[in-house]
Amino acid sequence: MAKTSMVNKANSKPKFAVRSYNRCQRCGRPRGYLRKFKMCRLCVRQLALRGEIPGVTKASW
């Protein structure tokens, strides 16, 4: 889990627009962010394996 202080800091409007960055909506993680799901890769994988994200399946070839 991300530090609460850092999540709050990211939610506030930055002095310059360039300083804003994306964070996972579930856990607040700043890295490995997937825009399509608005979550980090770990949360997407966790939900996809449980079948909670419609249309997402594990690849097999």
Curated annotation (Swiss-Prot):
GO terms for biological process: translation. Its cofactor is Zn(2+). Zn(2+) binds at C24, C27, C40, C43. InterPro entries: Ribosomal_uS14, Ribosomal_uS14_bact, Ribosomal_uS14_CS, Ribosomal_uS14_sf. One of its GO terms (molecular function) is zinc ion binding. It comes from the Bacteria. Binds 1 zinc ion per subunit. Keywords: Metal-binding, Ribonucleoprotein, Ribosomal protein, RNA-binding, rRNA-binding, Zinc. GO terms for cellular component: cytoplasm; small ribosomal subunit. It holds the Pfam family Ribosomal_S14. Part of the 30S ribosomal subunit. Contacts proteins S3 and S10. Binds 16S rRNA, required for the assembly of 30S particles and may also be responsible for determining the conformation of the 16S rRNA at the A site. Belongs to the universal ribosomal protein uS14 family. Zinc-binding uS14 subfamily. This is Small ribosomal subunit protein uS14. It comes from Magnetococcus marinus (strain ATCC BAA-1437 / JCM 17883 / MC-1).
